[in-house]
């Protein structure tokens, strides 16, 4: 995400409302620039514009995704920035309906020639509006909790070749069962993405290391790497590395970097052969 937009959302989350004049002063840009930022954020349903400023959107069933997007936002942005280092110009990637994958989309706006397969409406819209990516949206039923489409997507992938890399969020995970989802329909959709992908990267903040979920959508041997934040325990990392899955723990803003590791630095030695809602 553009750092200015992140600052706007952080300020909005702290007090519930912001003024254009205050944001322009604090961020050192013109009021015209701030108004454009607020308009763009409103189109993505992250705020509601008011006269002279903006407020948090009203909550409701349709607010579930927005709520998740703001929850643990600093960790998710750090995780997304690390994941973005794995994506090259021209890659064919899949992004699921998780809020962390949405943060990753915001990190990839300046990549050239991407093909992005996603069932997330907010993610598809931001890529459409602000990047040159070709966006493929398999059909399905709109799920309010995730602001995404769920349903059989195998047919949409047939004949399109392999996906280079899939980036997926989780509700929970275990080295015995793999990556887990709570909702059956979400799990089924993710299983199809995983099966069509050459590499699968799990993205989640450290709270998900203790998450509960029922349905496995990626077996441990299908997982290329995990990316979480520095709060994940050493035991968690050791358990996953024992089954051949490297774990990158990215530092939070203003935290120590000791003990963290880059996915790129580690996947060469330990990666597996090719192989309440969440986030």
What residues fall within each predicted segment?
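Amphipathic, positively biased hydrophobic alpha-helical segments used for protein targeting
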Residues: 63-64, 94, 101, 180, ...
């Amino acid at each position: 995400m553009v750092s200015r937009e992140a600052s706007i959302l952080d300020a909005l989350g702290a007090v519930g409302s912001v003024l254009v004049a205050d944001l322009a002063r604090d961020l050192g840009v013109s009021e015209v620039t701030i108004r454009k930022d607020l308009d763009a954020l409103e189109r993505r349903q992250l705020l509601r514009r008011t006269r002279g400023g903006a407020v948090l959107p009203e909550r409701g069933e349709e607010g579930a995704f927005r709520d998740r997007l703001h929850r643990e936002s600093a960790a998710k942005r750090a995780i997304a920035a690390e994941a973005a280092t794995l994506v090259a110009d021209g890659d064919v990637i899949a992004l699921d309906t998780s809020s962390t994958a949405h943060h990753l989309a915001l990190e990839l706006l300046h990549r050239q020639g991407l093909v992005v397969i996603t069932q997330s409406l907010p993610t598809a819209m931001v890529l459409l509006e602000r990047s040159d990516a070709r966006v493929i949206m398999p059909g399905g039923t709109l799920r309010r909790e995730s602001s995404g489409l769920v349903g059989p997507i195998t047919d949409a992938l047939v004949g399109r070749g392999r996906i280079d890399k899939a980036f997926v969020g989780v509700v929970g995970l275990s080295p015995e069962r793999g990556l887990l989802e709570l909702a059956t329909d979400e799990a089924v959709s993710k299983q199809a993405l995983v099966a069509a992908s050459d590499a699968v990267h799990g993205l989640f903040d450290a709270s998900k290391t203790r998450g509960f979920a029922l349905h496995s959508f990626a077996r441990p041997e299908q997982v290329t790497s995990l990316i979480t934040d520095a709060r994940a325990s050493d035991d968690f990392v050791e358990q996953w590395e024992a089954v051949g899955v490297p774990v990158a723990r990215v530092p939070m803003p203003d935290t120590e970097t000791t003990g963290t590791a880059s996915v790129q630095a580690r996947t060469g030695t330990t990666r597996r052969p090719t192989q309440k809602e969440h986030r």
